[in-house]
C-alpha cells in the first residue's frame, strides 16, 4: 500500500485524534492509519480528554486489542479516579499529563492516576508547565520517584520540545509537520530520517532558524 505523507517525510510513528465520533468509526480510522505505518504499535491515539467514568473503560476495552503505541488524554486531566480505572481496563500504554501544569498536579497524577512506570508515557508540556523551570521540577521529582527519563515525551506545536528532549535525555519529542503553522515542523534544512531528527548547530531554541516563526515575530514586533 502506498505510504502517506507523514511517512514520506521520514516519520515512522504517528498520532491521531479520536473520541469525537462513534468508537466503531474510530477503530476503522485506526486501522486505516496503522496501515500506513509499520504496524499499529507505531500509532498513538489522543482522546482529547473526551471520555468519562462510563465511556472511558468501555472505549479502553475496545482499544485494548489494537496494539497501539499509546492511548493519550483519556479523560478529564483531574479525574484521577477515572484515569486509574481506564489504566486498569487497558493493558497497553497510557499517556497523560499534557493538561496538567504544576508539580502539585503531577504528584497527584503519579499518586492517584494509576500510571505504571514500566509502560506509561508522561506528556507534560514544557511551555504549559509554568515554563521550563516548572517542567524541570516535574522531571526531577518524577524521576526521583522511579520514572525513567524515556517515559517523558513532551508535545509539539511550539518548536521547543526537541531541544528540551535533547538537553535532558528524554524519550522523544512530538513534531507536528503540518499543523500549528507557523510553529510546525523543524528548523530550516532539518528533517526527519527514519524517525529521528538532529538539532541545528546554532544558539537558541530553533525559532531563530525557522523561517515561518521568525517572520511572524518580525511582523508582530515590527522588526526589520
Task: For each feature predicted by the language model, list its residue ranges.
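Extended hydrophobic packing segments that form well-structured cores
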Residues: 204-224
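Structural signal for hydrophobic packing residues in well-ordered secondary-structure cores
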Residues: 34-37, 169-172, 221
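Shared catalytic-loop signature of beta/alpha-barrel
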Residues: 61, 67, 78-203
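Metal-dependent enolase-superfamily TIM-barrel catalytic cores that perform enediolate-based chemistry
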Residues: 1-90
